[in-house]
Amino acid sequence: MGGEQEEDRFDGMLLAMAQQHEGGVQELVNTFFSFLRRKTDFFVGGEEGMAEKLITQTFNHHNQLAQKARREKRARQETERREKAERAARLAKEAKSETSGPQIKELTDEEAERLQLEIDQKKDAENQEAQLKNGSLGSPGKQEAEEEEEEDDEKDKGKLKPNLGNGADLPSYRWTQTLSELDLAVPFCVNFRLKGKDVVVDIQRRHLRVGLKGQPAIVDGELYNEVKVEESSWLIEDGKVVTVHLEKINKMEWWSRLVSSDPEINTKKINPENSKLSDLDSETRSMVEKMMYDQRQKSMGLPTSDEQKKQEILKKFMDQHPEMDFSKARFN
């Protein structure tokens, strides 16, 4: 059998042929065998039974590959389903604990590490600020940076700070997100165990509705952006909490709100580290890692990766032209 690299050599031509057969695969296969019968000696050129044997061997080979691929796909889907269920259960548990009033919460290792990182970043930012005050007060560059920061802060004034899951904790529900998906937990204060017939969950490409039957919906509005309806799902946890899993179509953006009626979160304060980098493709992962690096640099008042490149280019230009005076030059 041909190697995997050779398998797709004729895909374009065969695909064009397949598109011309309205009868589907059966008609395509019939055309192929008709070609062998009319234009070659496939059926009569060898020993009796050889053609049939070759067909059977080829069929068995590709059937085994197809069955193996299907088993692997089912295993992946089962793993993803289990991970989603565990994530939904964890989200539901957190939402349920929040509705039961304030209490002491034991941090997981991951949360403790994240909290320590935030503390370290805050200390670094304070140290950097102290150094800037001691060394470069009144410089035009610093004044412009401060004005720009004040302007950005003004635009984000009134926006919510993201929760640990890069979403929002609202009075009636809680949502978290990664670049590719979003999870929602809606707790219901009822004195009975919820069943599917008791709730209304309507997931559309750009609209979401969640609530109890016969009562005003808890969530009912236009989504921030489009979702894949066929890959989204919902379930009931502990008989009290409805959890909804949404697959984003655009996997390269952070949502600032779940539905249009929600208050916005400040997406500049999102921590990309809360998203699983291992789940992203190499291109997306490198982009997210760049975002993480730039975010750390900004928090410490240091130049981002793009700004560093510009500074390097400028430095090379200045080194190549020592005769030019750049002391009064201003750069954006």
UniProtKB/Swiss-Prot annotation:
Keywords: Acetylation, Cell cycle, Cell division, Coiled coil, Cytoplasm, Cytoskeleton, Microtubule, Mitosis, Nucleus, Phosphoprotein
Residues found modified as Phosphothreonine: T108
Region called Interaction with EML4, residue ranges: 174-332
Assembly behavior: Interacts with PLK1, PAFAH1B1 and DCDC1. Part of a complex containing PLK1, NUDC, dynein and dynactin. Interacts with EML4 (via WD repeats).
Family: Belongs to the nudC family.
Entry-linked Pfam families: CS (PF04969), NuDC (PF16273), Nudc_N (PF14050)
Lineage: superkingdom: Eukaryota
Its biological purpose: Plays a role in neurogenesis and neuronal migration. Necessary for correct formation of mitotic spindles and chromosome separation during mitosis. Necessary for cytokinesis and cell proliferation.
Residue numbers carrying N6-acetyllysine: K240
Keyword Ribonucleoprotein: no
GO biological process: cell division; mitotic metaphase chromosome alignment; mitotic spindle organization; protein folding
Keyword Acetylation on entry: yes
Protein name as catalogued: Nuclear migration protein nudC
PROSITE patterns listed in its UniProt record: CS (PS51203)
Location in or out of the cell: Cytoplasm, Cytoskeleton; Nucleus; Cytoplasm, Cytoskeleton, Spindle; Midbody
Region (Disordered) location: 65-108, 126-171
PTM sites of type Phosphoserine: S136, S139, S260, S261, S275, S278, S286, S299, S327
Basic and acidic residues biased stretches: 75-97
Motif (Nuclear localization signal): 68-74
Molecular functions (GO terms): unfolded protein binding
Post-translational modification: Reversibly phosphorylated on serine residues during the M phase of the cell cycle. Phosphorylation on Ser-275 and Ser-327 is necessary for correct formation of mitotic spindles and chromosome separation during mitosis. Phosphorylated by PLK and other kinases.
Biased composition range(s): Acidic residues: 145-154
A cellular-component GO term for this protein: microtubule
Biased composition annotated in UniProt, kind: Polar residues: 128-137
Coiled coil: 60-134
